[in-house]
A protein has these predicted regions:
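N-proximal helix/coil linker or "cap" segments that precede and/or mark the start of modular domains
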Residues: 198-238, 250-254
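A short acidic/small-residue loop/turn micro-motif
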Residues: 95, 201, 252, 364-367
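A short beta-strand-turn-helix
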Residues: 235-257, 280-283
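Central antiparallel beta-sheet cores of small beta-barrel/beta-sandwich binding domains
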Residues: 15-82, 91, 98-100, 114-188
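Structural micro-motif
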Residues: 316-320, 337-349
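Thiol-/selenol-based redox modules, centered on thioredoxin-like
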Residues: 344-397
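Short active-site neighborhood of thiol/selenol oxidoreductases, capturing the structured segment around
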Residues: 246-270, 276, 290
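Structural microenvironment flanking redox-active thiols in thiol-disulfide oxidoreductases
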Residues: 271-316, 328-335
């Protein structure tokens, strides 16, 4: 029996190789994405892709007629059973409001794509219609190497890469990376886009959008969260090894300090990490220090520490990462009482040599925003350089 099970698993592993058209069945629509699987003997590797943006599975395991895809960065899994040329199962992820379980299916072959039609391509000013008011957003659609792609931009950064297809007057773009589950679907009605933004299994938010004209409807990222600048910025949290790290430790005295409030569950934080590491490595010899404050899902120290270690190793982060709390925005904000209006992960805090906050940047513009991403990375460097040029205060902060 054991031998036959091992043989079956080996045959299944080999047969899984190739491209798969995958989907999550949400309450109000279908989120499409691509899975690519490679086999080397019975060992499998693969990627989950939205257009040209791909996330590598940490492991793919086969047992009998079942396959388990793991995305350890986000504590997420896809488990499915092979039925002919189809996979049927569930996506699971543990969120701060409890586990998410969403039906999953896939069939062999390439995912259909289309170019960005002229009526859709470009920038749109959108309103997400809520029960307590409207929320401004910006939609950007363009032609990419893999067809129609785009992003959504809010006050605290972008929603990363979306990809999909469009017909004569309708469109649907998806974003799924193992953590966030997004579907943007709509139709052109006259000169207006109307549709629904889906987040997770059930959440649905109607939207309207018009061609972008005039000033942006969004706040500047530096105007979202305010800080008390009258006293030195204070923090005291433990690192993944249990060592207490505090703002008044000798390593920070008289230094420029950048504090990154992040979460390993946050794809935008993953996009920001390489830029922060590059900034640290180039300016650390000049007097820059950095600290990451991790706000995680589980609240279990051992579980959260393991995820933060994985995040640290993934990006080769050389500065301390501290366990600061859970990712509930209100609870996280309470751990940083000098900030007012904390709303976003990541939030980047720039602190001068005197220990006082000089700027707070909510969110991050990732590569999906194109030129905005490059401009933001350059802005971070300019802010640090201005602070480094200031004299070290006598006696320290």
């Amino acid at each position: 029996m054991l031998l036959s099970l091992i043989t079956m698993s080996g045959l299944l592993a080999t047969s899984l190789a190739g491209p798969w058209r995958a989907a999550l069945d949400l309450a109000g629509g279908t989120l499409k994405f691509r899975i690519e699987i490679e086999a080397e003997g019975t060992a499998l590797s693969g990627r989950l892709c939205n257009g040209q943006q791909c996330d590598t599975f940490s492991s793919i395991r086969v047992l009998g007629d079942s396959v388990r895809f793991e995305l350890a960065d986000y504590a997420a899994t896809i488990t499915a059973v092979l039925r002919g040329d189809s996979l049927v199962g569930f996506y699971r992820n543990v969120g701060n409001r409890g586990p998410r379980v969403i039906p999953f299916r896939a069939s062999r072959g390439e995912l259909s794509t289309s170019a960005a039609p002229e009526w859709l391509a470009g920038r749109w000013y959108a309103l997400f219609r809520g029960t307590i008011g409207d929320t401004p957003r910006i939609f950007e659609f363009r032609d990419g190497p893999a067809g129609l792609e785009g992003t959504i931009i809010g006050n605290s950064g972008d929603y990363s890469h979306f990809s999909g297809e469009a017909t004569r007057d309708s469109f649907a773009l998806s974003r799924f990376d193992g953590s966030f589950v997004y579907l943007l679907a709509g139709r052109l009605v006259g000169d207006t886009l109307r549709g629904t933004f889906h987040a997770g299994l059930k959440a649905q938010t109607p939207f309207v959008a018009v061609r972008a004209r005039g000033p942006s409807p969004l706040k500047l990222p530096t105007d979202v969260t305010r800080a008390d600048t009258t006293a030195p910025f204070r923090f005291a949290f433990r690192d993944v090894n249990g060592r207490l790290v505090q703002s008044d430790d000798p390593q920070f005295r008289g230094k420029v300090l950048v504090v990154d409030a992040f979460g390993t569950w946050c794809p935008t934080c993953h996009e920001a990490a390489p830029a922060l590491v590059d900034l640290y490595r180039s300016r650390h010899p000049l007097g820059l220090e950095m600290v990451g404050l991790a706000y995680e899902v589980s609240g279990d120290t051992a579980v959260d520490a393991a995820l933060v270690r994985r995040y640290r190793d993934k990006f080769d982060i050389p500065f301390p990462l501290l366990l600061a709390g859970t990712n509930d925005v209100d609870a996280a904000g309470a751990t940083l009482p000098q900030l007012v209006g904390f709303t976003a992960f990541p939030t980047t805090i720039f602190i001068g040599r005197d220990g006082r906050v000089r700027q707070v940047h909510a969110g991050f513009y990732g590569p999906a925003t194109g030129a905005q991403h490059g401009a933001l990375v350059a802005e971070f460097a300019r802010e640090v350089d201005l602070l480094l040029a200031e004299p070290v205060p006598v006696g320290g902060p």
